[in-house]
């Protein structure tokens, strides 16, 4: 009987379904030390954070552990230093002085346990620092060592000791890597300029390149802020691409340029004489050239040229006509003056008469003004150049001022008051307005017609009317009114502060009019005691310093004071000699603090021109046509002799 395949046995009915529960997916890593049968209750994370209170013993243990770890780390660092840092006594590039001692006495150095501290010595130049570049350090040391021994000029100062092994290693490196040890021009300049005294090094290199000293071409400016139009520039380490375009770069800011280029181991070296359109100081020129040449400012020498040196002018002239220079613009006058024969012959002789004539024509009578103004004419006047080349400048200035004062004084004394006012009016070009003066007099309650009458007598020096006194309270414009009048008339000012001297009245000898400002009580007493004859306008003697007494007639005198002498009986003898005007009202000002009445010289010019007939200073019709007199000339003319 066949088997009942696929049928259920006895006691079973239907299908039996079985479902598997999968806890781990395919590819999931299962830890070997993890018990898969134990259920995760979360109790294994209970003691992960220790929240028990910290006791004193545990804190000491932690501090001890930290200290032990720090000591271990420090010891490890020291071991690394001993392992990888070389001895400073072995490498001649690290410590030259001690390496020299090792070479001199190697046996003594071998038994030395410790190095004795050495005293610090001052050196003229600092030894350039040998930096550690990390990779390829041996080649850098060998290259630096060989170039120092090969260059004739050492900027470090002092010998360089080396041991036998170091020399052999250097020679081996040079022979093996000769192609990789060539420095560019920029690198050579940077190494050389590590010296402390950069300027001295640049001056030496300049002399080697050009064959003359840089100081022969320049004059030194101590201040970097002093301005000048001409500058001599020497630049080192310029790239060749910049040198080709330098002429075009400076052309917009210059009127003249003289450029020379030389090539040496550093690169391109520039020597230029430049005249700028606007005067510049050294700082401005250095920034400008550093930008155009693409080099640091301390790689340049910048000074003004020596304009009074014939040798310097001849150098620029001779080099300018050669093919080694690039010259653009008009040659400076100081070069032309010293290189052309005619100019050289004209500068030899100084004539004092020409200097006096110039001072007279320009109204210079003070020594300081004459010296300063005449020295500035050296560029255009041959006699001024000869004056600067003279060793007697102070004597010439003193003589010129003395002669000019004599001529001016004689010219003034030759004129009467009418001619003098006309002469003073010609000094001012503007016409002005006479009305502010009249309005100011009305503001002070001064009758205009009586004022003109008394002013007329004062100008002509009428006896007993030769002195005008303006009195009144302070701040009424007394000094302003009188000072403006005296300034227009070219008068002098005397002060009672010098009354202790016998010569305080000496300025009256050479004056057309005079002013005595702010007369006090003691001054009125002095005038009442000693100056009655002077106030009368009569001749009197004046004591002069280092000279004999001078017999003069006192010029018209105007005084200001806060004291009214008419109200005091003791000054009754002065009242008949002094004409009084009272200014009772304060001087008016506008909101901006400006004077409401303009009492200037041009307004006084218009005042005297307008009222010339009332003041009896009008000119005749013949004089209106012009002055027929010849102008003063202290320079001898040339006599033309006919055959």
UniProtKB/Swiss-Prot annotation:
Judging by the UniProt lineage, the source's domain of life is Viruses
Catalytic activity, EC: 5.6.2.4
Extent of motif Nuclear localization signal: 81-83
What are the recorded Gene Ontology BP terms?
Answer: DNA replication
Q: Does Methyltransferase count among this protein's keywords? A: no
Where is it localised? Host nucleus
What is known about its processing and modification? Phosphorylated.
* Functional note: ATP-dependent DNA 3'-5' helicase required for initiation of viral DNA replication. It forms a complex with the viral E2 protein. The E1-E2 complex binds to the replication origin which contains binding sites for both proteins. During the initial step, a dimer of E1 interacts with a dimer of protein E2 leading to a complex that binds the viral origin of replication with high specificity. Then, a second dimer of E1 displaces the E2 dimer in an ATP-dependent manner to form the E1 tetramer.
* UniProt subunit comment: Can form hexamers. Interacts with E2 protein; this interaction increases E1 DNA binding specificity. Interacts with host DNA polymerase subunit POLA2. Interacts with host single stranded DNA-binding protein RPA1. Interacts with host TOP1; this interaction stimulates the enzymatic activity of TOP1.
Name of the protein in its database record: Replication protein E1
């Amino acid at each position: 009987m066949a088997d009942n395949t696929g049928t259920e046995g006895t006691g079973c009915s239907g299908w039996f379904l079985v479902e598997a529960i999968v806890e781990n997916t395919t590819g999931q890593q299962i830890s070997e030390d993890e018990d898969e049968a134990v259920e995760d209750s979360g109790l294994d994370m209970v003691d992960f954070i220790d929240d028990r209170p910290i006791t004193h013993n545990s804190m000491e243990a932690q501090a001890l552990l930290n200290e032990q770890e720090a000591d271990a780390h420090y010891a490890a660092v020291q071991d690394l230093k001993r392992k990888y840092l070389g001895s400073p006594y072995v490498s001649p590039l690290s410590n030259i002085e001690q390496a020299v001692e090792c070479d001199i006495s190697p046996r003594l150095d071998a038994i030395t346990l410790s190095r004795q501290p050495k005293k610090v010595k001052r050196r003229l130049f600092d030894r350039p620092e040998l930096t550690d570049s990390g990779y390829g350090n041996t080649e850098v040391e060998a290259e630096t060592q060989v170039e120092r021994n090969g260059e004739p000029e050492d900027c470090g100062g002092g010998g360089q000791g080396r041991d036998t092994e170091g020399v052999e290693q250097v020679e081996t490196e040079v022979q093996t890597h000769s192609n990789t040890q060539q420095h560019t021009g920029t690198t050579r300049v940077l190494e050389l300029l590590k010296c402390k005294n950069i300027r001295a090094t640049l001056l030496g290199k300049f002399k080697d390149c050009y064959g003359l000293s840089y100081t022969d071409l320049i004059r030194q400016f101590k201040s970097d802020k002093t301005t000048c139009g001409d500058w001599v520039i020497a630049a080192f380490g310029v790239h060749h691409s910049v040198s080709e375009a330098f002429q075009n770069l400076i052309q917009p800011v210059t009127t003249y340029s003289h450029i020379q280029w030389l090539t040496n181991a550093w690169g391109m070296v520039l020597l230029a004489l430049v005249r700028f359109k606007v005067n510049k100081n050294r700082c401005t020129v250095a920034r400008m050239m550093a930008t155009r040449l693409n080099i640091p400012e301390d790689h340049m020498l910048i000074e003004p040229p020596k304009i009074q040196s014939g040798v310097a002018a001849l150098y620029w002239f001779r080099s300018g006509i050669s093919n080694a220079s690039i010259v653009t613009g008009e040659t400076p006058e100081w070069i032309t003056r010293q290189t052309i024969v005619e100019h050289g012959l004209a500068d030899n002789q100084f004539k004092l008469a020409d200097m006096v004539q110039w001072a007279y024509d320009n109204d210079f009578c003070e020594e300081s003004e004459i010296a300063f103004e005449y020295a500035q004419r050296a560029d255009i006047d041959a006699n001024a150049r000869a004056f600067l080349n003279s060793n007697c400048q102070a004597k010439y200035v003193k003589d010129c001022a003395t002669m000019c004062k004599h001529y001016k004084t004689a010219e003034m004394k030759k004129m009467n008051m009418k001619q003098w006012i006309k002469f003073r009016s010609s000094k001012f070009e503007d016409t002005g307005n006479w009305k502010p003066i009249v309005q100011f007099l009305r503001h002070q309650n001064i009758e205009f017609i009586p004022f003109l009458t008394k002013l007329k007598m004062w100008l002509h020096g009428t006896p007993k009317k030769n002195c005008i006194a303006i009195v009144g309270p302070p701040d009424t414009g007394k000094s302003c009114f009188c000072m403006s009048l005296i300034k227009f008339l070219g008068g002098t000012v005397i002060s009672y502060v010098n009354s202790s001297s016998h010569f305080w009245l000496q300025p009256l000898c050479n004056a057309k009019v005079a002013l005595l400002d702010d007369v006090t009580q003691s001054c009125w007493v002095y005038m009442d005691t000693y100056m009655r004859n002077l106030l009368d306008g009569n001749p009197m003697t004046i004591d002069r310093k280092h000279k004999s007494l001078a017999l003069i007639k006192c010029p018209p005198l105007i005084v200001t004071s806060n004291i009214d002498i008419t109200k005091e009986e003791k000054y009754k003898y002065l009242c008949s000699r002094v004409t009084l005007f009272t200014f009772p009202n304060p001087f008016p000002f506008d909101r901006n603090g400006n004077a409401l009445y303009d009492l200037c010289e041009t307004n006084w010019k218009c005042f005297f021109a307008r009222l010339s007939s009332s003041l009896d200073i009008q000119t005749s019709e013949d004089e209106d046509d012009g002055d027929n007199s010849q102008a003063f000339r202290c320079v001898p003319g040339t006599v033309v002799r006919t055959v």
